[in-house]
């Protein structure tokens, strides 16, 4: 298992394994700041372009224009498609990994910030941002299957074993995080728990039963079926980038520019692997 890290000032870096040293990856992108990885390739997003690379050797496959206000990237499990979420055009785009050609596009929300694919790669879930909605679309065609209405702006969403998990910014005395679940066949989301602070990132754990959620108050692990928190790391507040592989997690912290590698079962087992400015990291699992 390797790590790849993009930093807007320091470029792209790779660690050969969990404890290995970092080596710089040649990358011509201006201000790279997003990464995602799949079974055969990795995609790095910058201000104007995205670059697709092979997982082994990190050789260039293709270049493609970055969606305006690029907010998120993900790769299909088969490696054929790259999905780009645009926070300025309020849309999601499907491009071919091999050529960068734009083949599908669909509107999603207002200033959307997050999206993810299910395990099969056939459904894409997009959080609608400032719109009180989330959207379930087919992949790669981006045909809308369902619009999910939430009671407040939806900033992150994911697939768990019991359906969908939706993370929203709710208003009260202060803005806080409201987490909802939506079971298959049910008409509306059910509130699971309120968390302090505005919402950051979300990652569903590999077992499909837990979730890492970052808010202004820290990085937390949620037991979804029971609706209770298992732990909280206050020094990892507002992590925009979260990803898991097996028992390990990578947290890209927005406030302090750190990339932290930790066990999501034993969060005290952690270390900082990189410090930068605008950072985003993911696992290379191929």
Regions found by a protein language model. Name each.
Residues 1-286:
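Predominantly soluble domains enriched in secretory-pathway, periplasmic, or organellar proteins
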